[in-house]
Amino acid sequence: MLNKLIESLKNAPIIMKGDYPYFIHPLTDGVPELDPDIVREAVSGIIRIADLDVDKIVTIEAMGIPVATALSLAVNIPIVVVRKRSYGFPNEIVVDQQTGYSKGKLYINGIDKGDEVIVVDDVISTGGTALATLKALEKAGAIVKDFVTVIEKGDGAEKLRKMGYKIKSLVKIEVSKDGVKIVDHLR
């Protein structure tokens, strides 16, 4: 079911950013090119495991957008994109976000109190962006019914689960300088 996604992850090139092994994949980086079959597999997997009885799909700029858009088209639920720049709308939610390798602000528009949402993203690593987004959505009065990431690496998802968040993933990986190892995946 996730054959192309898994194979593409196993073949993903690794670059070193200092001492940090970083995998390059079309779904997480947009390069080299994003195979529509991989997006279809991801969306099919999300549909199988997600609670889609929601008002809106929330995704995080930039690489959550392709999967969330395809999901939106498949299930006819609108998307809210958490952006990296402000638009200055009156009810804009500003999110302070920090990951293992960057920090900055994120901006959420289009969320109303009582909205039931699912958060969909490409990858969760440290969990910093996910946690900041989840807390901001809760503060805005949204009801987060589910969080699904295509790829889980590192310990961020597990930390969030221990905090009581329901985090689901399609593929769990470990990354080393030698490559990507598939630890677990949706069957």
UniProtKB/Swiss-Prot annotation:
Keyword Transferase applies: yes
Gene Ontology CC annotations of this record: cytoplasm
The keyword Transferase is assigned to this record: yes
One Gene Ontology biological process: IMP salvage
Reaction equation(s) it catalyzes: IMP + diphosphate = hypoxanthine + 5-phospho-alpha-D-ribose 1-diphosphate; GMP + diphosphate = guanine + 5-phospho-alpha-D-ribose 1-diphosphate
Record-listed E.C. numbers: 2.4.2.8
PANTHER family in the record: HYPOXANTHINE/GUANINE PHOSPHORIBOSYLTRANSFERASE, XANTHINE PHOSPHORIBOSYLTRANSFERASE
Name this protein carries in UniProt: Hypoxanthine/guanine phosphoribosyltransferase
Organism from which the protein derives: Ferroglobus placidus (strain DSM 10642 / AEDII12DO)
